[in-house]
Amino acid sequence: MASRPSRVSAIAAASAAPAARASRTAARQARDNREALRADQRFDYSAIVDRPPLKVPRGVRLIVWPVVNIEEWEITRPMPRQYSSPPGGQSIVPDVQNWGWHEYGMRVGIWRIIESFRRHRIRPTMSINARVCETRPRVAQAALDAGWEFMAHTYVQMPIHQVEDQRAMIRQSVDVLRGFTGRTPTGWLGPGRGQTPATLDYVAEAGFKWFGDWVMDEQPFDVQTKHGPLLSIPYSVELNDIQIMVSSLHESDGMLRRARDAFDTLHRESKHGVRILSFGVHPYISGAAHRIRYFDAMLAYMRRQPGVVFWQGETIHDWYRDATRMGA
């Protein structure tokens, strides 16, 4: 029989083990960030006017990449964003008002968004926190049944620089999405498009092929990582209902007007080389009763123009790989 001091030592050692693991993980992540390439070292500059035209299927001029963001906001944390500031401007937990604003999207707004895409025969990409598959399986299943693409968007919505073990979080996200859909996700979007210096190395290491965090182009381009190239697919920060409706406080038709103007420009310019127009929406914003008619009108406007296709991220990735291989 073990003596009391031995038992106490064993308990102390067991208690210290998680802290030691966390310390090693933090040290490794800090080292990875120090050794990682800077963002501006991961790609070569390329002026779009200097590039040879990319081959596209006959009749295609403009690729539209629609993205719907489905997130898990934990009521025990500060909210990822606020529509209404608490009295006195102090952040509070639980922030019931802003949490409820987001939850409206999961209970009401998402069903309007799903119906609008169904009516226009468009299957978007869904940027999804993996935990949604566990806490809101009704939403995730409806998207899966509608043929939406699942793009990994971390496990739960929180700043990426606060994640203690990014590798583990990325693996967890992949495992949950694969278990729910039966397919391994190929695309990644960071929360708030956030990254630490080493994030893209972790993403490539986990087997992802493409990501949407960088907004600096209207065509895909390769980004270098320690584990081979990742394809950056341009995901617009300007055509996003957060920036338009929440940050800039536009009227309910603000996204329709901006999207129509952007679409017309890219559709005209695409005569000289294919362009990608992307837009991002959130169910608690675009799915609101006073905005859904304008969201639907935006889809209708794009749908009726000639030479336009609506593609998911993996389709864009595969097309670009084939197009650049043929042009090599």
Q: Predicted segments — roles?
A:
Residues R24-S232, L256-F279, I285-A328:
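Catalytic alpha-helical scaffold of carbohydrate-active enzymes acting on polysaccharides/glycoconjugates
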Residues P234-T265:
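A conserved mid-domain beta-alpha-beta active-site/ligand-binding segment of alpha/beta enzyme cores
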Residues M1-T25:
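Short amphipathic, positively biased membrane-proximal segments
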